Structures are given as C-alpha cells and as structure tokens.
C-alpha cells in the first residue's frame, strides 16, 4: 500500500517538475521518460544547448506556477502526516520525496517573486547552509602564491600568467581530452558495476558562445548504455585544472555515471522520481559534490598521484612546461579556495551586504577573476541560486562524509555506487548519519 501511495506522490513531483521547466528552462538536468529511448531524427544543434538533452514538447505545459505552488504544498502537508505510517524500509524514500517537494515549492515561490535570504534559499533548495568561510584563508593562499609562482609583476598578473602557461594548446586539445576521458572511464569500469558502454564520444569545435564549456547531444539510452556526444569548446581556456574538472566530474565517474545508475534504479524499481534530476534540488547538490570527490577517488584521494597523472596525460602530450608540475598541488588548493571566495561574494551580494563594486574589487583582489572582469562576474551573482554552495561546499561536505565512513578507497567506491542509486539525504550526509538501505541490512 505504501509503495502505491509514494509512487502517486512521486509521479506528481515529476509532472510538476516538468511543467515548471516552461518557466525555469535550465532546471531539468536529466530526464528519462521511459526504460529506453532513441533519437529518431537529426533535428538537433551543435551550436546551442538544450536542457535536458531533448525537447520536452507538450509535457512541460498544463500547470501554472500557482498550480505548482498549491499542489506541492498540499503534497508536503500530506507526506508529513503519512510519514508516520510508512515502514522503516520506506522512510528514506518518503523523506527524499518530502525534501524534493520542498525544493520544488521554494523555487516556484522564488519564480513568483517571493524573497529569501541566501541561507534560506540554499537550505530550501539543497538542504545545505554553508557557514561563513574563514576570510584569513584568502590572504594566506595569496601569500603562498607570492612565494611560489614564477614571473614578475603583481600577484594578480602572475596568476594570469600561470593560467596561460598551463593552458592546453588547441591543436593538442582533442588528444588530451580523449585520453583523459579514456583513463577516467577505465577506472570507473574497474571500480563500479557499469557496463562500459557509456563513454561519450569526444569532439572539439568552436561553439557560438565563447564562454560555453561544452555542448552535449544525447542520441539514446537503455539499461546498459548512454549514447552521448560531447563537443568541447575550442574557445574556452583549457587549463590543466579545467581539463580534470570537466572530464572527471562532468562525465565518468561523475555526472554521467550518476545518471546511468539512476536510470538503472528507475528500471529496477519503477520509482518515478529516479527519472529526473532537477538543478535546484539536493539530488543535484549530491551529484555536484560527489562527482568531484569521485574523480579524486580515481587517484586514491592522493593529490600527489593526481599531479603525476596530470604530468603524464596533460602536461607532456600538450607540450607544457614540466617545471610547472610541482606547482599544481598548490594551484589546486588555490582553485578550491577561489570557489569559496566566489561563494562569499555571491552570498554578500544576494543579501545586500556588498555592492556590485565591492564584490568586483574582492574578486579581482584575490585573482578570482581576471582584471576588468570583476564587475561583470559580481553582477551575475545578483541572480545566483547558490551555485557554489551546491558545488564547492557540497564537495567538502561529501568528502568529510566519505572519510568518516571509511578511509579504505574500495569501501568509498562501494558507498558512492550505492548512493548514486539511493534516496540520499544531504542533511544526513552533512551530519554523517546517512546509510543507503542496502548497506544497513
């Protein structure tokens, strides 16, 4: 009885999420409408993105934002009472559906004009509230860079110069991306129960939007296979750290592996909620954070092993200066701290504590954006929906959770695979109490 009731709630959650995309077009990150799908025509573009990877058509019409708000509120009230009747083995699913209905409701209210503080928003969308970062770390990392980075001029100029020196030349980009993709695919195959049929085709091209990183085309899927093409932008500045991020976390063992495991879970269980991943949800916060930790696991959570990989797979084939390899560990540390700098800028602008000009000055002071770009980037944070909370803070929250579970790398891989198919809870991951049911019984 409980499964039928929860299936009914989940079906309505999916329908409302699909309908909301009419008003919130970038929300739906992944959708599998059936156990299998094949693209039946060639009406797609390699010039602009479609989110999700194919047109939803009429299924995104039928409900207004007010309809979604009222219906989600009614389902939230119902689930809060109904939870008292479910069995222990259905509690995680009930909690998951309740969380995601609350995410949907808050995002809908925001689209209708309701105002929230930054922390209220990230709590409502991702079940995460990031504490204020230690601002002393911004000054500390700059001092480390001053001592280590080569070159002359201001530290901001030396940061820009270093980025340029670790940028993969466009003539070498396809080979570097292809071989890096193959490596991460092989590790994923070794560590997880995946079929091995889902490694994307890698292509490079100049995209219309020079700031766009890549463009994906989904040609089909079934239980054992995602048929994907990923076009990487030749106009994007492909530094070594960006190659690592956009291969390891965006593809395998990151997002694409997560999508594959959710698809398999949907087919195995017929749970409607496993067919979607909404950008504004704790599912996406888990995916963003865990995918970053998962690509670290490919190197046994060892930065020295990761840097050795970068030397062999990126520096050498790209013809980069090998003397710079020894600086990569410090550079990765800086990149992580930069994410928190952007998070704090976003929070302070959102909450009205900083002006755009103050945010711009902060970003440029620490080299978190190029000189002259601060105002444009800071202005974009007026409408930021907690991106860096769902990405950077989520990564560190999940990293701590995995390490609290076990430092054994094989056990962490086992945990990751289970979580990809589970009704995860970011709140319980935050307090380190969550265990997928398959690992409890």
Question: Where are the language model's segments positioned?
Answer:
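N-terminal maturation segment of proteins
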Residues: 1-441
């Amino acid at each position: 009885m409980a499964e039928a009731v929860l299936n009914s709630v989940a079906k309505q959650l999916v329908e409302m999420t699909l309908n909301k995309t009419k008003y919130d077009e970038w929300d739906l990150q992944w959708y599998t409408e059936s156990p299998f799908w094949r693209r039946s025509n060639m009406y797609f573009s390699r010039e602009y993105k479609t989110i999700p990877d194919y047109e939803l058509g009429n299924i995104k019409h039928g409900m207004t934002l007010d309809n979604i708000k009222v219906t989600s509120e009614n389902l939230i009230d119902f689930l809060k009472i109904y939870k008292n009747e479910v069995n222990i083995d259905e509690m995680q699913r009930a909690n998951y559906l309740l969380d995601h209905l609350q995410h949907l409701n808050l995002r809908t209210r925001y689209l209708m004009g309701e105002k929230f503080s930054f922390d209220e928003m990230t709590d409502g969308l991702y079940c995460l509230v990031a504490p204020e970062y230690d601002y002393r770390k911004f000054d500390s990392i700059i001092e480390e860079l001053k001592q280590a980075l080569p070159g002359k001029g201001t530290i901001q100029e030396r940061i820009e110069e270093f980025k340029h020196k670790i940028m993969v030349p466009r003539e070498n980009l396809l080979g570097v991306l292809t071989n890096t993709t193959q490596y991460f695919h092989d590790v994923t195959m070794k560590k997880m129960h995946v079929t091995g049929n889902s490694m994307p085709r890698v292509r490079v091209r100049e995209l219309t939007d020079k700031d766009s990183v890549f463009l994906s085309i989904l040609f089909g899927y079934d239980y054992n296979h995602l048929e994907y093409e990923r076009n990487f932008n030749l106009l994007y500045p492909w530094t070594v750290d960006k190659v690592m991020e956009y291969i390891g976390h965006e593809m395998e063992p990151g997002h694409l592996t997560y999508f594959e495991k959710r698809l398999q879970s949907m087919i195995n269980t017929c749970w409607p909620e496993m067919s979607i991943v909404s950008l504004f949800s704790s599912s996406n916060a888990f995916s963003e954070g865990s995918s970053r930790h998962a690509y670290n696991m490919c190197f046994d959570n060892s930065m020295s092993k990761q840097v050795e990989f970068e030397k062999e797979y990126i520096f050498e084939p790209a013809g980069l200066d090998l003397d710079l390899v020894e600086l990569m560990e410090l550079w990765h540390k800086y990149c992580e701290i930069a994410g928190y700098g952007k998070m704090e800028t976003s929070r302070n602008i959102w909450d009205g504590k900083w002006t755009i000009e103050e945010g711009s000055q902060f970003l440029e002071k620490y080299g978190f954006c190029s000189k002259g770009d601060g105002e444009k980037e800071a202005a974009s944070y007026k409408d930021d929906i907690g991106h860096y909370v769902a990405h950077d803070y989520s990564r560190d929250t999940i990293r701590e959770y995995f390490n609290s579970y076990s430092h054994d790398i094989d056990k962490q891989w086992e945990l990751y695979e289970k979580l990809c198919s589970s009704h995860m809870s970011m709140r319980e991951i935050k307090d380190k109490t969550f265990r997928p049911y398959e690992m409890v019984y």
